[in-house]
Amino acid sequence: MSANNERLRRARKVRMKIRELGTDRLCVHRTPRHMYAQVTTADGSKVLATASTLDKELRQGATGNVDAAKKVGQLIAERAKAAGIEKVAFDRSGYRYHGRVQALADAAREAGLQF
C-alpha cells in the first residue's frame, strides 16, 4: 500500500467519525507549494468558508512554509467566524499533526476558532 493510500485510509476513518458527531469540520489539504483550508458541513455537502495561500492577501510571500500556514489559519478562522461558526472538528486529512498542519491549527485556535 502506498503512503498516499494509507493517508487516504486514515482520512476516511476520521471523516466518518466526524460525520457521526454532526459538527462542522475544518478540512486541511497541503501540497508542496500551497496550503488549503475549508470549513464544510458535517456531511460535506456544503462549503461554508475557505482560505488558501492562493488568496490575493496571501499570494505575495512564500506559500509553502509554516508562516504561510499560520496566515491561512488566521484567515480561515476570521471567515468562519464571519459565517457564524464558532466550533468545528479538525480534519487533518490523514496528514501528521506536525509542521504546516500544526501551524494552521494553532493559528486558527488563537484567532478564536474552537476544536
UniProtKB/Swiss-Prot annotation:
Q: Some GO term, biological process aspect, for this entry: which one?
A: translation
Transmembrane regions listed in the UniProt entry: none
Domain of life (superkingdom): Bacteria
What are its GO cellular component terms?
Answer: cytosolic large ribosomal subunit
Q: Which GO terms describe its molecular function?
A: 5S rRNA binding; structural constituent of ribosome
**Which terms are listed as keywords in the entry?**
Ribonucleoprotein, Ribosomal protein, RNA-binding, rRNA-binding
- Identify the SUPFAM superfamilies for this entry: Translational machinery components (SSF53137)
What the entry lists under Pfam families is as follows:
Ribosomal_L18p (PF00861)
Tell me the NCBIfam families matching this sequence.
L18_bact
What role does this protein play? This is one of the proteins that bind and probably mediate the attachment of the 5S RNA into the large ribosomal subunit, where it forms part of the central protuberance.
- Can you tell me which family this protein belongs to? Belongs to the universal ribosomal protein uL18 family.
Tell me the subunit arrangement: Part of the 50S ribosomal subunit; part of the 5S rRNA/L5/L18/L25 subcomplex. Contacts the 5S and 23S rRNAs.
What name appears for this protein in its UniProt entry?
Answer: Large ribosomal subunit protein uL18
